[in-house]
């Protein structure tokens, strides 16, 4: 997916100089992730379990994100984001776990897989467009591709829960830039059902603090460090599903304005 997106960006770059876009910012980040919480229960007789039961807190995991933001004039922005997350751990179960009617007895050595890939589209309206300070508000829609699976290492038992769903959220972003062009930012997506959607209770949040600095005099290429908290889950009684997780990320990234880079590239002979 990452290679396909980068190829598409390179193919479309020659046309950017003639486009009405004010900016087209490509961004990539990577770094370690840690699981603070990952609780689950699946099936009418399902057993509640935690991240510790599956050794998910024993390691850091590599994370990455790719985003592309189109700035349409001074006020409007559209962001496309791809955020994969896929981990597998091995554990000796400290208790019996019933997963969708399949019972994994105490002492069973299992491989546990947790997949949560996110494809997100966001719209932002620039409410404040100051020289140093900007504030955007808007909304996001995320398609999530989720899979939770347990499998005995000896091959005797296997169970899984998979789902593709659509989640909406409100979004805001603030950024302050110093005269040196070093900048700090806060970005958040969040929504809760507050128990208003019948037999479903759930929520989602994605909050990031960023410190960035320019890598060239033009200021159209930046490096940044980012701390992110991501979490959410749902209790869906009609489907006998409960999952709630909280994850932390510490990443480094780079972003580049493709429109600006094309405009100042030397003309072809």
Which residues does each PLM region occupy?
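Outer-membrane beta-barrel pore domains and translocons
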Residues: 29-35, 83-85, 126, 140-144, ...
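Extracellular/periplasm-exposed beta-strand and loop segments of Gram-negative cell-envelope proteins
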Residues: 36-61, 84-117, 143-164, 193-200, ...
